[in-house]
Amino acid sequence: MNFQQLRFVREAVRQNMNLTEVANVLYTSQSGVSKQIKDLEDELGVDIFIRRGKRLTGLTEPGKAVHQLIERMLLDAENLRRVARQFADQDSGHLVVATTHTQARYALPKVIRQFTDVFPKVHLALRQGSPQQIAQMILNGEADLGISTEALDRYPDIVTFPCYSWHHTVVVPKGHPLVGRENLTLEEIAEYPIITYDQDFTGRSHIDQAFTQAGAVPDVVLTAIDADVIKTYVELGMGIGVVAAMAYDPQRDTGLVALDTQHLFEASTTRVGLRKGAFLRAYAYRLIEMFAPHLNEAEIAGLLREAV
């Protein structure tokens, strides 16, 4: 048994049993992948995969248990390497943060600047994606941590911590009839074409829920994953925008007005997500603490251990 065999099994599951893709990802041949997996099965004395001819179609019952152990073993192996690097050089290394456009564009810049000032030798990578993509990057070990409002708390192998809460706001062009109107209602907003986020992005579910509970039917004419795109089309007069309040900057968005709508939409909570059992370098904890000062390394590390 060797780690390469374990990686082949893990990657076969990740690639939906497509051995061609496994070979491409791990830079080897398909026949080599098949042989290594079969050698491991022979050594263990069980079939890990269900086969139809030469094709893998799923995991056997013992294969499911083996796969869970392999994931654990490979995570522990990576943790060992991280522990060694932690003591070899505590202030340098790599840190991958998976997050959404909204967080990367509006919530993280000051934190990232502070972090790079404190840890100039750490190579930081921001990988943007949908909340579901962020979760997969965490689970696959492609990201050290993820930051998102949606999805992360739906995965049992991801431990999440609340960072901060925020509300949506409505933005309209200057001179719009809604500007200056007091005690704005969702029924009044629904009288105009609406531009807002795609489903599963930036608290869209809270927007839909608010209109449903008010008995109002919004005319959503355009959706996007990016608040900058939403604001651009609002400025063009195509509708009014519903965006995260943090996305409105009166100094930059000079052609727009943000309306007082905090009372209309439920607060959303942005969370940081970490894979259960993962070992984090000290500087990763510092980044989390800079982003959410109420969190601390001892609390986070303790919950990561308890979750295993």
UniProtKB/Swiss-Prot annotation:
The gene is ssuR. It comes from the Bacteria. Disulfide bonds: none annotated. Transmembrane segments: none annotated. Residues 19-38 bind DNA. Residues 1-59 form the HTH lysR-type domain. NCBIfam families: PRK12684.1 (NF009327). InterPro entries: CysB_PBP2, LysR_subst-bd, Tscrpt_reg_HTH_LysR, WH-like_DNA-bd_sf, WH_DNA-bd_sf. This is HTH-type transcriptional regulator SsuR. Pfam families: HTH_1, LysR_substrate. It comes from Burkholderia cenocepacia (strain ATCC BAA-245 / DSM 16553 / LMG 16656 / NCTC 13227 / J2315 / CF5610) (Burkholderia cepacia (strain J2315)). Transcriptional regulator that is essential for the utilization of a number of organic sulfur sources of either environmental or human origin. Required for aliphatic sulfonate utilization. Binds to DNA at target promoter regions. Targets include the ssuDBC operon, the tauABC operon, three tauD-type genes and atsA.
